[in-house]
Amino acid sequence: IDITRLKVVVFKRFIQKWFSSFIRENEANKLTGAVPYVLGIGLTLFSYQTGIATAAILFLACGDVMATTVGERYGRTKIAGGKSLEGTIAFVVAAVLSGVLLNLTVIQLPCSLLRAGAMVAAVVELLPLPLNDNLVIPVVSGGAMELIARTTGFT
């Protein structure tokens, strides 16, 4: 859909008319974050055990949204790449809380593993990477949790 939006003028007009509120201004003439978001989720689900994949996806879904919301609205202390300390703290809090809530389901992960994964996800969100963070956050945080789980004996 995203590629068609960019290549087919009639479709682009339709999307602009009905869905413009969902597309950021800086994404009007390029791929939106949806493609790397779906790829990141798919790679994460394919690569890691269910609990770790679910936590990593929640870190992206909850943490990234809170970082953007809080950072844009209340971000005063700039740290890396124009990101704010307030947004980063919001990311960590949202990611950890989503992990805690995940533990209320049938999926049970050690809180220390969730905290480590949330911190890795927040650091990845701060880095000026050439790839979209929607792709990188769940893959890297999931990989970190998988590595920690395997080296500590949690599986």
Can you name each region flagged by the protein language model?
Residues D2-L102, L109-T151:
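Interhelical loop and helix-boundary elements at the membrane-water interface
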